[in-house]
């Protein structure tokens, strides 16, 4: 079912480049451990889409084209640790963590236009540029205190805290033609 009465074809080409890296470094010692994790994900997409056809009602040829280039990146790193501590007869464990991540999406140039009956439709021409950046910072800890009551009983008290800060910025620029009114 084709409500617009358009017959034609759709072409799409896509070039994609991706890079992924993950690293872990840790150290264990008598009273605990420290662990560092880092992740990097990066990709670029270069896409061309073209829709061409003939509108059967008015016998017009139509072409719709979109050219798009997008870069994406995620960088994340964390540092965490566990320390076992002893206070009088209380066994305790401190788990702590620090985290930082940054996400970027950059679309430095996206173009679209529409051709009808061999003529460029000026109001269809659009160029767009956008940049999205998000940064997250986290700091947290958990503390366990365990105390025994006799040979078979014990209790554990746990508390913790998390401080998290997130910031997002978006810049978007869109340029196109608008028809004017003439006096």
What would you call each of these model-derived segments?
Residues 30, 48, 55-61, 69:
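Intrinsically disordered, low-complexity, charge-biased terminal/linker regions in eukaryotic proteins
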Residues 28-43, 66-183:
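Face-selective signature of the C-terminal outer-membrane beta-barrel domain
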Residues 1-49, 72-77:
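Transmembrane beta-barrel wall of Gram-negative outer-membrane proteins
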Residues 2-7, 53-63, 116-126:
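Flexible, solvent-exposed coil segments and beta strand-coil junctions
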């Amino acid at each position: 079912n084709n409500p617009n009465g358009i017959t034609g074809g759709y072409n799409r080409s896509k070039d994609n480049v991706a890079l992924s890296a993950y690293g872990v470094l840790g150290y264990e010692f008598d009273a605990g451990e420290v662990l560092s994790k880092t992740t990097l994900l990066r990709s670029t997409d270069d896409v061309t889409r073209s829709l061409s056809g003939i509108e059967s009602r008015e016998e017009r040829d139509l072409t719709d084209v979109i050219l798009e280039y997008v870069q994406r990146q995620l960088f994340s790193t964390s540092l965490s640790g566990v320390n076992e501590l002893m206070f009088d007869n209380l066994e305790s464990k401190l788990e702590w963590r620090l985290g930082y991540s940054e996400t970027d999406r950059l679309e430095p140039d996206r173009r679209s236009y529409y051709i009808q009956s061999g003529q460029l439709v000026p109001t269809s021409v659009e160029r767009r540029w956008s940049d999205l950046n998000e940064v997250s910072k986290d700091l947290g800890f958990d503390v366990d205190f365990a105390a025994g009551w006799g040979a078979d009983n014990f209790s554990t008290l746990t508390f913790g805290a998390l401080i998290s800060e997130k910031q997002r910025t978006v810049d978007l620029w869109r340029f196109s033609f608008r028809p004017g009114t003439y006096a």
